[in-house]
A protein has these predicted regions:
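Extended, charged catalytic domains and RNA/DNA-binding interfaces, predominantly
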Residues: 284-324, 331-713
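Extracellular/luminal Pro/Thr/Ser-rich low-complexity repeat and linker "mucin-like" segments
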Residues: 103-107, 114-159, 278-301, 390, ...
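Ser/Thr/Pro/Gly-rich, low-complexity intrinsically disordered stalk/linker tracts of secreted
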Residues: 64-273
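Extracellular/luminal low-complexity segments enriched in Ser/Thr/Pro
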Residues: 149, 209-211, 281, 334-339
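Sec-dependent N-terminal signal peptides
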Residues: 38-48
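C-terminal motif of bacterial Sec signal peptides marking the signal peptidase cleavage site
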Residues: 53-54
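Proline-enriched interdomain boundary motifs that mark the N-terminal boundary
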Residues: 272-276, 620
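N-terminal secretory signal peptides that target proteins for export/translocation
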Residues: 1-37
Length: 713
C-alpha cells in the first residue's frame, strides 16, 4: 500500500536502467516480512518491465559530409492533432500506471494510530578501526542508532523497519553474514521482548516484535556495520544524511515512517581534483571572480586541502600568481581577476599539496571570450534535487555549491512534488524551507536563484516548474486537478512561470507529446541531463530506454518550435557539475541575457536565446542572415535572395571532433582536427516555410553542445 504522510518505503534500485538512473524512492508501506517479500518482488518486476518498455528510436536522418545537405531542402510532416480537455486520457507510450496508482492509493490509505510512533537518533559513529567519526564519503564504518517506542508502543507481531538510502551505494543492512559489509545487529534491554530481524535483500531491515509488546519509551539498539568490514556509506558528502525508521504498530502489515529521521554527517573523501570556473564572456577591463575548488573524486566540496594553487594566466588576463590554502577553507576560494585584453583566453592551474607526500592536481578553466559589447552568456542549472525528495544534501548546501564551486549564474532546485520519503505536496514546511532558501541566496546582478519543483507525472512524463518570483504553488501531478499538462498549464496561466519537459525521449518515463509544448509556458525543452540526451537517436549520448519517435528532433520535424537547454537533473548536490560524478555526462543551459536577474532570465528563455550542453562550458554563436539562435524568421518575400548566410563560431573546452548542421532532420558534418576555436561562414539555400536549423558540437572528449534552432515562419 502507499502512504501519504511520509510513510514511504524505498525498494532496491535497479541499476542504471530504472531505479538508479531515475534516482527514485519507492513509496510503499506493506511490511515485506508479512508477505514473504512478494511486495518488493512486484516492485522489482515493475522496474524490469520499465526497462523492457524502452525501444530503439530511429529517424531517417543520415550524416553526410558538409555541403551535401546544406544544398538540400526538406519539409516536415504535418502536425499531429492537439490534445484538449474534452478528449479521453492519452498517456506516454511508456507510462508507469502501476507507480501512479500506488502513489495515488497511498494518499487515502488509513493507518493505525500506533503506526509511525516513536523517535530515533544516532548514538555513535566510528571507522572500522574504532576511531570515532565523522565518516568520509565512500568509507566503511559503524553507525549505532536507537529507536524509542512512542506512546502507543508496538504490539506483538508489529514491526520496526530500519532503512538506509537506496542511492549512492550505501550497503544494505543485512543480518545474514557477519563477514560481509553491511552486517547489522539489533538488541533491546526490554525484558520479555524478542526481536526477530528479517532482511529481504533490500535497503531495509524488518525487526519483528515477539514475546510481548514494546512499550512506550522502550528502546531498540541498531548497529549498522557491526561486522569487521563495517558498512559503506554515501559516496557523496552531505550534511544530515537520513536514516529512517518506520513502524507497523498494530501488526496489520501497514506501516508509517516516524516524524523525523536519524541523521549523520558524511564528510568529503580526500582531495582528488582541481576545478576552476570562470565567466565565459567579459569585456576588456572587466573584473571577474575565478572559483577555485579542490574536490574529492566524486566532486564533493569540503576537503581539507593544504597547499597552494598556482595559476598560468595568458597575456591579457590578470590573476595572482598563486593562492594559499590553509586547510580551513573547505577546499574552495574566490580569486579575483581582471580581463585586460580582448581575445580568447584559457587559464591553467596547478594545486600542490603542502603536507607529507606532495600531490599535484592540474586543471584548465573554461575559456574566456573577451570582446567589446559581447553578448553575455549566463550559465544555468535549473533542474536538480536535494534530500527533500530523492537527492543528497540540504537546499542551503545546494545553492552554496552552485555559486561557490560551480560558479553558476542562475540556478533552481526542483525537488519532486510527490516522490521520496516525505512529499512536498503534503509537507508545506518543506516547501517553505525551499522558498526561504531561494530568497536568502538570491543576489540580482551576481547570482540568480529561481523557485521550482518537479511535476512528477508517471502518466505524461516529468516536467519541472519554475517561478520567476518569490512565491509559487505546488500543483501536484498526483492531484486530479493537475494530473495532465493542460491542467498544469491552466493553473500556471498568467503567472511568471515556465515548465520544462525533460528526459523526454525515454529514461524513467518519456514525455507525452500528444500535449504540444505550450507556446508561452514551455518555449524551451531540456535535451541533456544525467539521463543522457533526448535530442535525437543519433546523439553520441542518447538517453537509455528510448521511445521511437519521441526525441526532440522528431518533435521539430512535425512542426513544433522549442529552444534547447541542458540541466543536470543531479541528485548528488552538485548543481552545475553533475557530470563530475556521472560517467554519462550532465547538462547546462547557456542563456543569453545582459541583465542578470529573474526578469532577464525569463525574457531570454521565452525568446529561446539559449543553447544546451552536457555539462561542458562550450561557447558558440550561430546566426542566419543575422537571426540568432531561437529566432523565428519572418515569412519569405519575393525580394528575398535564394540563399542565406550561415555564421558559426565555436570556442570549446577541448579538441573539437565534429560540428553538425541539422536542417529539418538532415545532417551535414564538418570533420575537424582538434581545433579549439573554429568558425565557418557560408551561403546556404534559404530555409523554406516550416523548416528549422540548429548546430551540434562534438568534442573528442564526448562534450556536447546544441544551439537552439532557427525557424522559418
Amino acid at each position: 500500500m502507499i502512504s501519504s504522510r511520509g510513510n514511504s518505503l524505498r525498494g532496491r534500485s535497479l541499476g542504471h536502467n530504472f531505479g538508479d538512473a531515475c534516482k527514485s524512492k519507492w513509496s510503499v508501506t506493506r511490511s515485506t516480512s508479512k508477505t514473504d517479500s512478494r511486495w518488493i518482488l512486484a516492485l522489482l518486476a515493475l522496474g524490469l518491465s520499465a526497462v523492457l518498455l524502452g525501444c530503439s528510436g530511429e529517424s531517417d536522418s543520415t550524416v553526410r559530409p558538409a555541403g551535401d545537405v546544406l544544398n538540400t531542402k526538406s519539409k516536415p510532416a504535418g502536425l499531429p492533432p492537439a490534445a484538449s480537455q474534452d478528449e479521453g486520457p492519452v498517456y506516454s507510450v511508456d507510462a508507469k500506471h502501476d507507480i501512479h496508482n500506488m502513489l495515488r492509493s497511498g494518499m487515502t490509505t488509513p493507518v493505525d494510530p500506533s503506526d509511525g510512533g516513536g523517535k530515533a537518533w544516532l548514538v555513535s559513529e566510528a571507522r572500522i578501526n574504532g576511531t570515532p567519526g565523522p565518516l568520509r564519503a565512500g568509507e566503511a564504518g559503524r553507525l549505532e542508532f536507537i529507536y524509542e517506542a512512542g506512546p502507543l508502543g508496538v504490539a506483538v507481531d508489529g514491526e520496526v523497519h530500519f532503512q538506509v538510502s537506496s542511492f549512492w551505494q550505501w550497503d544494505p543492512p543485512q543480518n545474514k553474514d557477519p563477514e560481509s559489509r553491511g552486517y547489522t545487529t539489533v538488541r533491546t534491554d526490554a525484558d520479555g521482548v524478542e526481536l526477530t530481524p528479517v532482511w529481504h535483500g533490500t535497503e531495509l531491515l524488518a525487526i519483528g516484535i515477539a514475546g510481548r509488546s514494546l512499550e512506550a519509551g522502550e528502546q531498540i539498539h541498531v548497529t549498522y556495520g557491526a561486522g569487521k568490514f563495517g558498512a559503506k556509506v554515501d559516496i557523496f558528502a552531505e550534511r544530515g544524511a537520513e536514516h529512517w525508521f518506520s513502524v507497523d504498530g498494530d501488526g496489520d502489515g501497514l506501516r508509517k515512517f516516524i516524524d523525523a529521521p536519524a541523521t549523520v554527517d558524511i564528510i568529503s573523501a580526500p582531495s582528488a581534483q582541481l576545478v576552476v570556473m570562470v565567466p565565459t564572456t567579459l569585456e576588456p577591463g572587466e573584473e571577474f571572480i575565478a572559483f577555485v575548488s579542490i574536490l574529492d573524486k566524486m566532486g564533493s566540496t569540503g576537503t581539507r586541502f593544504s597547499g597552494i594553487v598556482e595559476f598560468d594566466a595568458p597575456d591579457g588576463i590578470e590573476l595572482p600568481a598563486r593562492v594559499k590554502f590553509s586547510g580551513n577553507e573547505g577546499g574552495r576560494q574566490r580569486v579575483p581577476g581582471i580581463a585586460r585584453k580582448a581575445g580568447v583566453h584559457r587559464i591553467s592551474a596547478t594545486a600542490i599539496s603542502g603536507k607529507g607526500q606532495k600531490l599535484e592536481y592540474k586543471a584548465t578553466a573554461n575559456p574566456i571570450i573577451v570582446e567589446e559589447n559581447i553578448a553575455r552568456v549566463r550559465w544555468a542549472d535549473i533542474h536538480g534535487h536535494s534530500k527533500l525528495s530523492d537527492g543528497t544534501g540540504t537546499p542551503d548546501d545546494y545553492f552554496t555549491y552552485a555559486r561557490e564551486v560551480a560558479g553558476l549564474d542562475i540556478v533552481s532546485l526542483t525537488d519532486h512534488d510527490h516522490w521520496g520519503i516525505q512529499f512536498l505536496d503534503e509537507h508545506p514546511e518543506m516547501w517553505q524551507l525551499i522558498r526561504d532558501t531561494v530568497k536568502a541566496h538570491h543576489r540580482p546582478g551576481e547570482f540568480v536563484t529561481v523557485l521550482g519543483y518537479e511535476w512528477t507525472s508517471w502518466l505524461h512524463g516529468h516536467r519541472h516548474v519554475i517561478y520567476f518570483e518569490d512565491e509559487g504553488e505546488i500543483y501536484s501531478a498526483l492531484d486530479p486537478k493537475y494530473e495532465n499538462p493542460l491542467q498544469l498549464w491552466d493553473a500556471l496561466s498568467g503567472q511568471p512561470a515556465l515548465t520544462f519537459a525533460h528526459h523526454s525521449a525515454g529514461g524513467p518515463v518519456s514525455t507525452n507529446w500528444y500535449y504540444p509544448p505550450h507556446s508561452v509556458l514551455e518555449p524551451v525543452t531540456e535535451i541533456s541531463s544525467v539521463h543522457g540526451s533526448s535530442e535525437s537517436h543519433d546523439s553520441p549520448s542518447a538517453i537509455y530506454n528510448p521511445v521511437r519517435g519521441n526525441f526532440v528532433r522528431d518533435l521539430l520535424n512535425v512542426g513544433f518550435r522549442v529552444g534547447f537547454i541542458g540541466s543536470g537533473d543531479g541528485h548528488d548536490g552538485h548543481p552545475g557539475l553533475a557530470h563530475l560524478g556521472n560517467d554519462g555526462g550532465g547538462g547546462l543551459a547557456a542563456i543569453f541575457t545582459e541583465e542578470l536577474s529573474r526578469e532577464g532570465t525569463l525574457e531570454a528563455l521565452r525568446a529561446r536565446r539559449t543553447y544546451a550542453t552536457n555539462g561542458a562550458r562550450i561557447w558558440m554563436q550561430v546566426s542566419l542572415d543575422g537571426h540568432v539562435m531561437g529566432t523565428t524568421m519572418p515569412p519569405r518575400t519575393e525580394a528575398d535572395a535564394a540563399t542565406q548566410t550561415l555564421k558559426i563560431r565555436v570556442v570549446s573546452e577541448g579538441p573539437l571532433k565534429h560540428v553538425d548542421i541539422v536542417r529539418s532532420g538532415n545532417i551535414s558534418r564538418f570533420d575537424l582536427n582538434g581545433e579549439l576555436d573554429w568558425s565557418n561562414e557560408r551561403a546556404i539555400p534559404r530555409l523554406e516555410r516550416g523548416e528549422y536549423q540548429y548546430i551540434r558540437v562534438i568534442e573528442e572528449s564526448g562534450a556536447l553542445a546544441w544551439s537552439s534552432p532557427i525557424f522559418a515562419n
